[in-house]
Amino acid sequence: MRKINLLDLETTNKIAAGEVIERPFSVVKELVENSIDAGAKNITIEIEDGGQKLIKIIDDGEGIYPIDIKNAFLPHATSKINSIEDIYKISTMGFRGEALASISSVSKTKLKSRVDSYNFGKEIYIEGGKIEYLKDTGCNVGTTIEVSDLFYNVPARLKFLKSARSDSSSISDIVNRFILAHPDISFNLINKGKQSIKSYGTGNLKDSIRCVYNKTISENLINFESHKDIISVYGFIGKTEISRKSRTNQSIFVNKRYVKSKFITAAVENAFKSFLTVNSYPFFVIFIDIFPEYIDVNVHPTKSEVKFKDERAMFKTIFDAVHEAIKGELKESFTNFFNKEDINIYDSEKSITEPIKLEKEEVQIPIDLNSNNKIDIFGNNINKLPNNTELLKNIGVKAKNTLENNNDFYTSKQNEIYYANKNDECLNSCNKDNYSKIEKSLQKDNKNPDTLYLNEHNTNSSSINIKENKPNNFYVDMKIIGQFNNTYILIEKDKELYIIDQHAAHEKVLFEKFKSEIEKGYVISQILLSPVVIELSEDEFNIYEENKDIFKNSGFSVETFGEYTINIKEVPLILGKPNVENLFMDILYNLKNMKSKETSTIKYNAIATLACKSAVKANDNLKEEEIKKLIEDMLILNNPYTCPHGRPTMIKFTLKDLEKKFKRIQ
């Protein structure tokens, strides 16, 4: 082994500079952050050759006291903290005291600064970490710093620099992030003597977004905010029209600091999941204000990453805020169409074991449900009534399928649903008045029988609730024009034209049904003919061990088969015929990286695919009653506006929109 040597100060400074100063944009970032901490309201950045030849920062901040000018360039010299405890209370951009020392050790640096209480300022010039001179000078209040010939004394770093154009682009990007983070500060970027970027410091975030991007983006934004005890989440998300194929238009700011965070990005993108198409990424500018003691900003040399005390709670707060904002925007767009006061909506979330106030046309019939007579999760296999339950059949108890039943109705197949019961005594004990009420209700209008909705929330319950879904005013001012190309449904309502994609709409109805089954725990498993054996890494196996219940509740039957090997015997029937190993590993990956514990989330894509395959297709001819049924089912949904893959289920044209198209109005 070689002898251990103590490195001299110059060498250690150059090594430290390599961590803090990667490229010219790193210099701009550190110096502009110093200007912001100094309270500057106007900051000018001048660069030449992508910052490799010259970087000049001029601000009107508080300035540096003459006595501190020399100390400012010493390693770990800072005015921001006094002890290690202060790091966890930090509210400024910088705090380590490394930037100026690192920059001056690998460049030629000149700094001039003056505070308001002095009539003159100080100027210092440092070359390669050595002070060449320190003198009095005349200058404005604030600080001007010039960094030239970056890495001139570190040839190994110099040859790895990118092109001037690439570095200029990186500097422009970081300046744009500053403009977004600080709308109250005016930034001016000058490249080769020409103005490249200019913001006006109006304090309005929308003005900053328009400055950084363009008018189109600034006019397609959705505001959102959520405030908790220790955290506030707010900002703007873009409408689906301005989504992109990359994440370049995404900005995250934690306490005004621009950071990169995979889990925050995942929270926002998951909120957009059912609103965007595959491989599309949302636009967003998100601000997170949190007490400093709940984050650690000292986990990365450039402070571009932060660590949160409770990432799970943070994920939920961000997801909920963004998701509600998107839903609210879409809901507002289709307020006239989805006016749920116009129709009696069946409450599929209410448990049948709860007392329910029966309205005029409602009947409850107690039925003993034997475990052998379960309704299939897709509503396909239903046993016929034996013996005296034939009474229900004879009076014509029929039900068109709903969210809780198979939607074969849309393919012109109307199923008769008979209530299976092997315990005849239960039915015999029913009040005869109930049957007369049912018969009256069903025979009220033989030409247009009312639709009955059936719900079996729990196969162990002793009763089934039958509720009539009777339209009130919904169809009064709605006119079904028909189908276009047997694919799009045309509807006129309140002087607005709605075009519904029948496949996307039905796909969403089915998806919500499948999703509901999983959330309520009614998952039926299918036994595999050949169990699937999967070898896991130690880390993957530990994640599985921590989340056994998740897999069990999702319909998996898994056994340990060796040290880090598992044996899968059963998988959820609802997912059809998946690639078992890929599905299992996808869930495991989500549990590790997305912090998701909801089975509905970790199986989202598989459910969406199944719904897509089961839904009515383009070119399927639908009758008017089938169209009405589809619309009624859409009304029940919390989010009927997009299919699970993010495509819109419907679009709207107002009378004004059409008259503009035909040049009737301007």
From Swiss-Prot:
<dbReference type="InterPro" id="IPR014762">
    <property type="entry name" value="DNA_mismatch_repair_CS"/>
</dbReference>
<dbReference type="InterPro" id="IPR042121">
    <property type="entry name" value="MutL_C_regsub"/>
</dbReference>
<dbReference type="GO" id="GO:0032300">
    <property type="term" value="C:mismatch repair complex"/>
</dbReference>
<dbReference type="Pfam" id="PF13589">
    <property type="entry name" value="HATPase_c_3"/>
</dbReference>
<dbReference type="InterPro" id="IPR038973">
    <property type="entry name" value="MutL/Mlh/Pms-like"/>
</dbReference>
<dbReference type="Pfam" id="PF08676">
    <property type="entry name" value="MutL_C"/>
</dbReference>
<dbReference type="InterPro" id="IPR002099">
    <property type="entry name" value="MutL/Mlh/PMS"/>
</dbReference>
<dbReference type="GO" id="GO:0005524">
    <property type="term" value="F:ATP binding"/>
</dbReference>
<keyword id="KW-0227">DNA damage</keyword>
<dbReference type="GO" id="GO:0140664">
    <property type="term" value="F:ATP-dependent DNA damage sensor activity"/>
</dbReference>
<dbReference type="GO" id="GO:0016887">
    <property type="term" value="F:ATP hydrolysis activity"/>
</dbReference>
<dbReference type="Pfam" id="PF01119">
    <property type="entry name" value="DNA_mis_repair"/>
</dbReference>
<dbReference type="InterPro" id="IPR020667">
    <property type="entry name" value="DNA_mismatch_repair_MutL"/>
</dbReference>
<dbReference type="InterPro" id="IPR014721">
    <property type="entry name" value="Ribsml_uS5_D2-typ_fold_subgr"/>
</dbReference>
<dbReference type="GO" id="GO:0006298">
    <property type="term" value="P:mismatch repair"/>
</dbReference>
<dbReference type="InterPro" id="IPR037198">
    <property type="entry name" value="MutL_C_sf"/>
</dbReference>
<dbReference type="InterPro" id="IPR013507">
    <property type="entry name" value="DNA_mismatch_S5_2-like"/>
</dbReference>
<keyword id="KW-0234">DNA repair</keyword>
<dbReference type="InterPro" id="IPR042120">
    <property type="entry name" value="MutL_C_dimsub"/>
</dbReference>
<dbReference type="InterPro" id="IPR020568">
    <property type="entry name" value="Ribosomal_Su5_D2-typ_SF"/>
</dbReference>
<dbReference type="InterPro" id="IPR014790">
    <property type="entry name" value="MutL_C"/>
</dbReference>
<comment type="similarity">
    <text>Belongs to the DNA mismatch repair MutL/HexB family.</text>
</comment>
<dbReference type="InterPro" id="IPR036890">
    <property type="entry name" value="HATPase_C_sf"/>
</dbReference>
<comment type="function">
    <text>This protein is involved in the repair of mismatches in DNA. It is required for dam-dependent methyl-directed DNA mismatch repair. May act as a 'molecular matchmaker', a protein that promotes the formation of a stable complex between two or more DNA-binding proteins in an ATP-dependent manner without itself being part of a final effector complex.</text>
</comment>
<dbReference type="GO" id="GO:0030983">
    <property type="term" value="F:mismatched DNA binding"/>
</dbReference>
<protein>
    <recommendedName>
        <fullName>DNA mismatch repair protein MutL</fullName>
    </recommendedName>
</protein>
